Amino acid sequence: MMIKNKKKLLFLCLLVILIATAYISFVTGTIKLSFNDLFTKFTTGSNEAVDSIIDLRLPRILIALMVGAMLAVSGALLQAALQNPLAEANIIGVSSGALIMRALCMLFIPQLYFYLPLLSFIGGLIPFLIIIVLHSKFRFNAVSMILVGVALFVLLNGVLEILTQNPLMKIPQGLTMKIWSDVYILAVSALLGLILTLLLSLKLNLLNLDDVQARSIGFNIDRYRWLTGLLAVFLASATVAIVGQLAFLGIIVPHVVRKLVGGNYRVLIPFSTVIGAWLLLVADLLGRVIQPPLEIPANAILMIVGGPMLIYLICQSQRNRI
């Protein structure tokens, strides 16, 4: 009981930190806001500075929160589905496949912009299925599976590089220049994906069982691995549709959360949601304040943090002979 209470208290503290960070992000930038500006806006309904920030900065903050949460949860789900602690959508090529589909859709069927998350999901599904088929045939260990994923990532990024030589297929990536329609599109996918994940989290711990144990209790482990993998691909692909590729969030956050609260997915999923949202928001905030008026992409900061962590996890997996 005491451990449960500690986890609840920690979760509430993280929520407070997340809200505080969102507020700091909202008032910080080339246009700075004071508390008086906000007070004037909410009492009189009129403040030009606040109005401009609501249109320019608030969509960016909301998208950062949703994308961070979705990528963190996607990473946790992929690791459960593939039984691989190194799995992450960007590393195994899912994000690249989704980005190629996004580019093709924007060129040939731009009128379907509001369906980009679903169309990107189709693109992200292809490399995931390739990984599954190859793994079922060759039974890769954790590191070998990641190497195959990296090969797919390189291949698909090469295809993407060729496609984007066409000026009509240039893809804006990152959190800049986001508008409210982007928020609405992503919010639908975020709500759907995260609600389904919370429902599925009741069964995720059983994915650690082997096939014999699962069958002995009547649990269809293959079906749930597929459902978990598909949901992970959907969450990651939906973020790609709006912000492009963001590296390593899906591998950093689940491992940090496991260190904090253990591997129970009923606890891991909510914590990953909050910490993932906070981490991307912090990366975006740092990118805006380190060298103003220039902006460092949040993805660059994530890569600086995530690269060493991936090396550490690979070394650890080799040591444990995963």
UniProtKB/Swiss-Prot annotation:
UniProt organism field: Staphylococcus aureus (strain bovine RF122 / ET3-1)
Broad class of the protein's primary localization: membrane
Compartment(s) of residence: Cell membrane
Signal peptide: none
PANTHER family, per database record: FERRIC ENTEROBACTIN TRANSPORT SYSTEM PERMEASE PROTEIN, HEME-IRON TRANSPORT SYSTEM PERMEASE PROTEIN ISDF-RELATED
Membrane topology designation: Multi-pass membrane protein
Superkingdom, natural source: Bacteria
GO biological process terms on file: siderophore-dependent iron import into cell
Role according to the record: Part of the binding-protein-dependent transport system for heme-iron. Responsible for the translocation of the substrate across the membrane.
Keyword terms, alphabetized: Cell membrane, Iron, Membrane, Transmembrane, Transmembrane helix, Transport
Name the UniProt record assigns to this protein: Probable heme-iron transport system permease protein IsdF
Family indicated by similarity: Belongs to the binding-protein-dependent transport system permease family. FecCD subfamily.
Xref: InterPro entries: ABC_BtuC-like, ABC_transptr_permease_BtuC
Classification of source organism: Bacteria, Bacillati, Bacillota, Bacilli, Bacillales
Record's note on what induces expression: Repressed by fur in the presence of iron.
One Gene Ontology CC term in the entry: plasma membrane
Residues spanning the membrane: 9-29, 61-81, 89-109, 114-134, 143-163, 179-199, 233-253, 267-287, 294-314
GO MF, one example: transmembrane transporter activity
